[in-house]
Amino acid sequence: MNIVDSNCTIWHKARNSKFRHIVWPIRSYELTKFIPMTLLMFFILLNQNLVRSIKDSFVVTLISSEVLSFIKLWGEMPMGVLFVILYSKLCNIMTTEQVFRIITSTFLFFFAIFGFILFPYKEFFHPNPELINQYIIVLPHLKWFLIIWGQWSLVLFYIMGELWPVIVFTLLYWQLANKITKVEEAPRFYSFFTLFGQTNLLFSGTVIIYFAKSEHFLLPLFAHLNDTNEILLKSFITVILISGLICLALHKLIDKSVVEADKNIKFKNQRTDILKLSLLESAKIILTSRYLGFICLLVMSYSMSINLIEGLWMSKVKQLYPATKDFISYHGEVLFWTGVLTLVSAFLGSSLIRIYGWFWGAIITPIMMFVAGVMFFSFTIFEQHLGNIVNTLGYSSPLVIIVFIGGLWHVFAKSVKYSLFDATKEMVYIPLDNEIKTKGKAAVDVMGAKIGKSIGAIIQFISFSIFPNAVHNDIAGLLMVTFIIVCILWLYGVKVLSQNYNKMIKR
C-alpha cells in the first residue's frame, strides 16, 4: 500500500512540476479542444504549402518572376478588399462557423476547376499567344498586363492561392482559436498549436519532393497524359482536395464538441455570436483604434518585407532551376528545412513568451528577417565580385551561393513567422471585445497583408512599367533600401504595441 501511495505521490509531483509545465503545459481535460484545433491547423497549412509551391513554381517558370508584383498589386489587393466587404456582410447573417465552411468550400471548388478544367484546356480558355506578342510590340509599357491577360487562369489560381493563407488560416482559423481559447490558456496553447500544426512543413516538403519525381502512387490515374506539368498539377490538386475535406470534417467536429459545449445552446438560430453591426459602423471602430493600427503595421511590415525579397529570390531560383519540376522540388526542400527550424523555434518560442513576455517573442521575427534579408541583398548586388568566395567554398558559380542564401533567408523568415509572429500577433486580439476581435481582425489581417504586399509591389510595378525590359537584378539596390526602412518601422511598431498590450492585460 505504501508503494502504491509512494508511486502516486511521485506521479502527482511529476505532473505538477515546473519542468512538466515548461515541456508540456496542456492539461488532460483540455485535449478535447487542443487536439482537433491542432489537426485543423495541420491540414489547413498542408494545403497552404502545397498550393504555394504550385502557384510559385508554375507562374515563375511558365510566365516570369517579374509578373508577381503586377499580380499582387492589381489582383490580390482588389480581391482582399472585396473579401473584407463580403466577409463582414456574411458575419451579419450567418454564424462564424457557417462562414468558415462556405469560404473553405469555395476555395476547394475553384482549385478543382483549375486543376481539372482550366489548366488542361488552357489553349481553349486563353487568348492566342501570337496576338499577345503583337499587342506587346504596339504597347510595350503594358507588357506585363498583356502577359497576365494571356495567362489569366494561372494568374487567378495564384491570387486564390495567396488568399488561402490570409483568409482561411490567418483570419478564419485564428478567429476560431480566439473564440474558444481563454486568456489564461493562450500563452500555453498558441505556441503548441504552432509546434504541432507546423509539423506539416516536414510532411508537405516531403510530399512535394515525392510528387516532383517521375514515379508516385497517383501516376496510374494520369498515365494517359503527356504533359508533365499537367500530371504534376492534377496530382497535387487531388491531395489538396482530400486535405480540404478533412479540414471541413474537423471544423464540424470542433463546432459540435467545443463551440456548442461552451455555449450550451441547443439550436444554432439562438447563437449569440452573430454580429449585427453594419460595415460602416465596424470601419469607424477600426479606423479610430490606435491599437489596431499598430497590429496592422506589424502585418504590413511582414508582408512588405517578404514581397521585396521574394521576386528577386525566385528569379535567381529560376535561373538555377528553369524546369517546373526542378523548381518545385527545390521548393519542397526549402519547405522541409523550414519545418525543421519551425519545430525548434516553436518549442523555444513557447517558453520564451511565457518566461520573458510578449515583447521578446514578437521582436525576434523582424530581427531575423533583417539580418538574413540584408545578407541576401548584399550577395545579389555584389554577385560579380564573389568569384574568390565561390571558389573558396567550392561552389560552381555565384548563382549557387546566392540561391542558397535566399533559401536560408526563406527558412529563417518563415520559421520565426510561423512559430512566433503568428502566435504573438493573435495574442494581442484576445483582450479586445467581440466586434473588434471579429471584424477588426478581418480588416487588419486581410487588408494589412494586402496593403503591405501592394506597397512593395508598387515599387516593382513602376520600375517594370517604365522599363519594360528590366529584371529584378536591375532594381536590387532600390529594394534593399526600402527593405531596411520597413524593418526599422517594424521594430518601432513592436515596441509601441507591447506597451499597449501590457496595459490592456493589466486591466
From Swiss-Prot:
Membrane topology: Multi-pass membrane protein
Pfam families: TLC
InterPro entries linked to this entry: ADP_ATP_car_bac_type (IPR004667)
Entry's Gene Ontology cellular component terms: plasma membrane
Highest rank taxon of the organism: Bacteria
Residue intervals passing through the bilayer: 31-51, 67-87, 99-119, 130-150, 154-174, 192-212, 231-251, 292-312, 333-353, 357-377, 393-413, 451-471, 474-494
Keywords linked to the UniProt accession: ATP-binding, Cell membrane, Membrane, Nucleotide-binding, Transmembrane, Transmembrane helix, Transport
Keyword Protein transport part of the UniProt annotation: no
Gene Ontology terms for molecular function: ATP binding; ATP:ADP antiporter activity
Signal peptide residue numbers: none
Main location (coarse class): membrane
Localization terms from the record: Cell membrane
Family the entry assigns: Belongs to the ADP/ATP translocase tlc family.
Job description of the protein: Provides the rickettsial cell with host ATP in exchange for rickettsial ADP. This is an obligate exchange system. This energy acquiring activity is an important component of rickettsial parasitism.
PANTHER family reported for this sequence: ADP,ATP CARRIER PROTEIN 1 (PTHR31187:SF1), PTHR31187
Protein's name in the database: ADP,ATP carrier protein 2
Gene (UniProt): tlcB
